[in-house]
Amino acid sequence: MEKTKRLIVRRDAIGFIKSILESYEDIGVLSVIDGDKGLIEIIYSAFFEEDLIAILKDMKNNGIDYMEVNDG
């Protein structure tokens, strides 16, 4: 099953986050929804949800902060 997470991140961190996710093949696909606001969307398989959450937590622990946003 496909799932999504929307996050607001610093604009200058978008490329770094994308490269981290790409280095973990099949974890998720990052799309920029609004680059000016730093709004990104990650589409991922429910199978990899725990892995994705662990990667995001590790990034936050290393200074790449984000805020998860809900649709609507």
Whereabouts are the PLM-identified features?
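A generic structural signal for short, solvent-exposed coil/turn residues
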Residues: 1, 22, 34, 58-60
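Short glycine-/aliphatic-rich beta-strand segments at the starts of folded cytosolic domains
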Residues: 1-9
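Short, highly charged low-complexity linear segments
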Residues: 2, 38-40, 64-66
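Amphipathic, hydrophobic secondary-structure cores in small proteins
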Residues: 9-50
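C-terminal structural segments of small proteins and small subunits
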Residues: 43-72
